[in-house]
Amino acid sequence: MLNLKSFLAVDFGAGSLKLAEFEVNEAGGLRLKQFVIKSLGSEGSQEAKREATVLKALQDVLVEKDIKAKGINVCAPGFHVFSKFVKLPPVDSGKVTQIIQYEAQQNVPFPLEEVVWDYQIL
């Protein structure tokens, strides 16, 4: 992501949309260019209206603040994601992916083809 001149970090929270625009300097460091918090109001917590409310809020902020960044990092609210810690048996690294996929199939309450999932070995 840092090969871009600027990028956005977006947090779709339960009650507000938070957006930060960063510029990348020559040394690879980040500079906060602007930060916006926009309330989603009561419609932001109503499941039937949430998607349209968040989309409108995001479009409004992008236009109002004249944001041109092409890259984006998204943070989803906790009630839209879940995590699971799994203790793996000692196996060679080639089998880790198979074990993780099996564990995901057992623990994710949706078909894996319909979700975005990933893992990190700690």
Model-derived segments and spans:
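Hydrophobic/aromatic-enriched cytosolic interaction surfaces used to assemble or bind macromolecules
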Residues: M1-L122
